[in-house]
């Protein structure tokens, strides 16, 4: 029987750990650092920080961990995979060189240009005045991006030149390189794929909701909810995404000498002229993972082991239901949040920034939990989730009431 270590402590890692626990080959799932909400599902949490690579390697060796799965982007960008590989331990995730596809927007844009992968035109700037001058000459809307990792909050779609100038000034406070990108109109979606060398397993499509408030108002967040599959993303669109983006990305990594075992997450947009890449992430999305992995009907542990050994995995996904999840966050999110706010306990939820005990959880950060449901249609799945939330004592926690609404423009219950 196998022991699995999941690195991270959020709702995504809770879902990954539950999927690993469902494997008949797995005896124990550890999560470092995890959170108290995970303990409710029999996951063993560890007092080891996700950036303490030496501590994680020592634990993996001492507890005969056969597979480590990395959830968040920050340890990947810092080289956790290289560290584990140097210690001879099996780990699923991109090495530090490949992780630049997410950790540097400039690296990603150059990669897409080199390998003819469709994406918006852009210019990069290293000093404020030239960026402001260029922005002023361009039409709006325009997209301002920080080069490095920004927890999903490093992008501004500016609808006026004044807003663009303010975003550029803010961006240069945290980054030495800023990108100004042409705005592309279309329908956004997430397409993730588990990759091992030239082999891959495609996940169902998903759409997350980045803005804090209903009708896509308010500030950007890490994500306030998601649903899957996305009705507007037809089999023909998926085929186009595979042919023009996913397979060229996998081939491009190989051509550039970047060995790859991990997740490629395409933040895609369906435009009038086809699918384009908005951004790459090299890890599973949060909150999408929480409504994607429950759709897997195969052994998740075996899928990952096969990919690590560069074998084609058997990954079967359900095709008859829609899965939908709503994130609940502490008051103040995505700004400074109130700690110690009571968080309801409910079976099946995925917990994130919580403290306390498994039976008495309290907020310890921004997003605290995600409530999910599945049903034969998107409308029914949405209804089921909000009925669950209505029965919880959510108190001062904040959440959106319209998750899934975008998908309904193409569906009827």
Swiss-Prot record:
Keyword Magnesium in annotation: yes
Binding note for cofactor: Binds 1 Mg(2+) or Mn(2+) ion per subunit.
GO biological process entries: 'de novo' IMP biosynthetic process; purine nucleobase biosynthetic process
InterPro entries: ATP-grasp, ATP_grasp_subdomain_1, PreATP-grasp_dom_sf, PRibGlycinamid_synth_ATP-grasp, PRibGlycinamide_synth, PRibGlycinamide_synth_C-dom, PRibGlycinamide_synth_C_sf, PRibGlycinamide_synth_CS
EC category: ligase
Superkingdom, natural source: Bacteria
Protein name: Phosphoribosylamine--glycine ligase
């Amino acid at each position: 029987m196998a022991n699995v270590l999941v690195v991270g402590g959020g709702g995504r890692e809770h879902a990954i750990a539950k999927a690993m626990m469902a494997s008949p080959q797995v005896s124990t799932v550890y999560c470092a650092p995890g959170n108290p909400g995970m303990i409710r599902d029999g996951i063993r949490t560890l007092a080891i920080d996700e950036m303490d690579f030496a501590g994680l390697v020592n634990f993996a060796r001492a507890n005969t961990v056969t597979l480590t799965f990395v959830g968040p982007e920050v340890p990947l960008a810092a080289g956790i995979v290289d560290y584990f590989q140097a210690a001879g331990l099996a780990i699923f995730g991109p090495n530090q060189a490949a992780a630049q596809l997410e950790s540097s927007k400039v690296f990603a844009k150059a990669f897409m240009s080199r390998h003819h992968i469709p994406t918006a035109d852009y210019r990069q700037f290293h000093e404020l005045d030239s960026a402001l001058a260029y922005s002023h000459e361009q039409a709006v809307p325009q997209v301002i991006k920080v080069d490095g990792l920004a927890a999903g909050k490093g992008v501004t779609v500016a609808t006026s030149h004044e807003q663009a100038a303010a975003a550029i000034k803010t961006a240069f406070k945290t980054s030495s390189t800023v990108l100004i990108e042409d705005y592309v109109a279309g329908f956004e979606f997430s397409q993730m794929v588990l990759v091992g060398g030239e082999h891959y397993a495609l996940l169902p499509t998903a759409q997350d909701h980045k803005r804090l408030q209903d009708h896509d108002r308010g500030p950007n967040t890490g994500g306030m909810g998601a649903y899957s599959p996305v009705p507007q993303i037809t089999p023909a669109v998926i085929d186009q995404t595979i042919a023009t983006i996913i397979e060229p990305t996998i081939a491009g990594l190989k051509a550039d000498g970047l060995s790859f075992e991990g997740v490629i997450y395409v933040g895609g947009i369906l435009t009038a002229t086809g699918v384009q890449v908005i951004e790459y992430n090299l890890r599973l999305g949060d909150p999408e993972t929480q409504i994607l992995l429950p759709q897997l009907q195969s052994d998740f542990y075996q899928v990952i082991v096969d990919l690590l050994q560069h074998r084609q995995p058997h990954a079967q996904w359900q095709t008859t239901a829609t899965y939908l999840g709503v994130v609940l966050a502490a008051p103040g999110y995505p700004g400074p949040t109130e700690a110690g706010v009571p968080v309801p306990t409910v079976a099946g939820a995925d917990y994130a920034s919580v403290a306390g005990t498994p039976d008495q959880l309290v907020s310890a950060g921004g997003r605290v939990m995600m409530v999910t449901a599945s049903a034969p249609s998107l409308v029914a799945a949405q209804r089921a989730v909000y009925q669950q939330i209505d029965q919880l004592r959510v108190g001062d926690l904040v959440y959106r009431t319209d998750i899934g609404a975008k998908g309904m423009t193409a569906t009827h219950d």
